[in-house]
Amino acid sequence: GRQMACFPFYNPYTISRCKDCPDRPGTMGLVKVPDNELCAACKMIREMTRRKETLKIRRKEIQKEASGLKKEVFRNPGFGKEIHVTGKSIKEWLNQPHRRYAEKNELLLQIREVLQKAGYLGYGIDKHDAGTVAHLFETVVGKEKSWIIVREYANGEVNLHSISDSDNILK
């Protein structure tokens, strides 16, 4: 309600402080849990901490499951080369920030289908390594466009690299 009742109601001073809280609903992007008694009692922050732990556990499970992908070869109809997954690409994918972080991580386990359906957009020089070619594939994660990055190295290796939800990658 108006007083944000999910926050603890100790006295008029604390409730007015909750109104100014940068971690209140609608403004949250919690990286570090505030270290004070009022925030420790906050139902919202406790729930966010619990969700963060759940995501961390699931990320480790996905990393373990995805290790089986290293033995497989993947293809895209618009791209004429075989795509491989490495341990490095699994880690990079899972560490990549994304607006739909959990959905993006789960997508890794369905990478065969995702790459099959993804639209091949073309290639360019990788901005992190001038000797590497970056190929881009467009996909959708939770109704929002995202771009899968596949790197082609000078030795001919073609590996899944990562995924991004930033359209800056198209520039």
Q: Residues of each region from the PLM?
A:
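Ribonuclease/tRNase effector modules and their secretory precursors
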Residues: 2-27, 34-37, 41-171
